[in-house]
From Swiss-Prot:
GO terms for molecular function: bitter taste receptor activity; G protein-coupled receptor activity. It comes from the Eukaryota. It is a multi-pass membrane protein. Its main location: membrane. GO terms for cellular component: plasma membrane. The keyword Glycoprotein applies. The lineage of its organism: Eukaryota, Metazoa, Chordata, Craniata, Vertebrata. Glycans are attached at N167. Keywords: G-protein coupled receptor, Glycoprotein, Membrane, Receptor, Sensory transduction, Taste, Transducer, Transmembrane, Transmembrane helix. SUPFAM superfamilies: Family A G protein-coupled receptor-like (SSF81321). Coiled coil: none annotated. This is Taste receptor type 2 member 41.
Length: 307
C-alpha cells in the first residue's frame, strides 16, 4: 500500500513538474519573442519573464534532483553533486522570491488608491526602477548563495577531501548545519516575504476602503476601478496562498524534518513545488496578452487534432 502511494505521488509530482515547466516556458517564449520583436518590455513583462526563467530553471533543477537523489541515495549523500545542486537551488529560490515580491509591489502601486505623498512618489518612480531591481535581486541572490556555501562548506569538506578532522569538529559542523543555517536562511527568506506581505495588505486595504466609499455614495460596485481592485486582489490572494505554502515548505526543508527515507517525502515535494507549477497558469489567465496567445495556440492545436 505504501509503495503504491509513493508511486502515485511520484507520478503526480512528475505531471505537476511538466505542467510547471511548460507554463513557465510559455511565458518566457511569448514575452521573449515580444522583447526581440520590439526591443523593449513593459515593467510588468520584465518581472514576468524574469520570474518565468527562474521558475523554469527551479522546476527543472528540482525535478532532476529528486529523481537523481532517489536513484543514488548513498552516492549523493556524500558527493559533490549535493553541493552542486544546493548552490543552484538556493540561488534560484532566492531570485524567485525576490521577483515575486517585486511583482506584488508593482500590483500594489498600479492598483492601490492611496494618496499619501510617499506612495504617490513610489507609484511614479517604481516602474523605472524595475530593471535595476531585477538585476540587483540576481546579484544579491548570487552573493548570498556564495556566502551560504562558504558558511556551510566546513560541514561537507570532510567528504570533499575524504578525511575527518576529529569528533569535535564534526560535532561543530553538524551543529552549524542543523541549527545555525536554518535560522540564517529564515532571516534571508523573510526579507522578500515581508515586502510581499506589506504590498498585498496595502492593496487589500485599498480595495476595502474603495468598496466602502462606493457603497456609502450609492454607486455601482461594477465600476472599472472596483473591478481592477477585485481582479488584482483575487490574483494576489491566490498568489499569497501559494507564496506562503512555498515559504513554509522552504522552512521545513531547511530543518531537514522530512528526508528521502520518510514516507511523506514525495507528497511533501509535491507541496513544495505546487506554487512554482500552479501560479504560472494564474498569471497566464490574468494577463490579456498571455491569455490571448494561449487560446490561439489551443485553437491551433485543436485544428491540427481535428484534421
Amino acid at each position: 500500500m505504501q509503495a503504491a502511494l509513493t508511486a502515485f505521488f511520484m507520478l503526480f509530482f512528475s505531471l505537476l513538474s511538466l505542467l510547471g515547466i511548460a507554463a513557465n516556458g510559455f511565458i518566457v517564449l511569448v514575452l521573449g519573442r515580444e522583447w526581440l520583436q520590439y526591443g523593449r518590455l513593459l515593467p510588468l513583462d520584465m518581472i514576468l519573464i524574469s520570474l518565468g526563467v527562474s521558475r523554469f530553471c527551479l522546476q527543472l533543477v528540482g525535478t532532476v534532483y529528486n529523481f537523481y537523489y532517489s536513484a543514488h541515495k548513498v552516492e549523493y549523500s556524500g558527493g559533490l553533486s549535493r553541493q552542486f545542486f544546493h548552490l543552484h537551488w538556493h540561488f534560484l529560490n532566492l531570485a524567485t522570491f525576490x521577483f515575486c515580491s517585486w511583482l506584488s509591489v508593482l500590483f500594489c502601486v498600479k492598483x492601490a488608491n492611496i494618496t499619501h505623498p510617499t506612495f504617490l512618489w513610489l507609484k511614479w518612480r517604481f516602474p523605472g526602477w524595475v530593471p535595476w531591481l531585477l538585476l540587483g535581486s540576481v546579484l544579491i541572490s548570487f552573493i548570498i548563495t556564495l556566502l551560504l556555501f562558504w558558511v556551510n562548506y566546513p560541514v561537507y569538506q570532510e567528504f570533499l577531501i575524504r578525511k575527518f578532522s576529529g569528533n569535535m569538529t564534526y560535532e561543530w559542523n553538524t551543529r552549524i548545519e542543523m541549527y545555525y543555517l536554518p535560522s540564517l536562511k529564515l532571516v534571508i527568506w523573510s526579507i522578500p516575504c515581508s515586502v510581499f506581505l506589506v504590498s498585498i495588505m496595502l492593496l487589500i486595504n485599498s480595495l476595502r476602503r474603495h468598496t466602502w466609499r462606493m457603497q456609502h455614495n450609492g454607486h455601482s460596485l461594477q465600476d472599472p476601478s472596483t473591478q481592477a481592485h477585485t481582479r488584482a486582489x483575487k490574483s494576489l490572494i491566490s498568489f499569497l496562498i501559494l507564496y506562503v505554502l512555498s515559504f513554509l515548505s522552504l522552512i521545513i526543508d531547511a530543518t531537514k524534518f522530512i528526508s528521502m527515507q520518510n514516507d511523506f517525502y514525495w507528497p511533501w515535494q509535491t507541496a513544495v513545488y505546487l506554487g512554482v507549477s500552479v501560479h504560472p497558469f494564474i498569471l497566464i489567465f490574468s494577463n490579456l496578452k498571455l491569455r490571448s496567445v494561449f487560446w490561439k495556440l489551443l485553437l491551433l492545436a485543436r485544428g491540427f487534432w481535428v484534421a
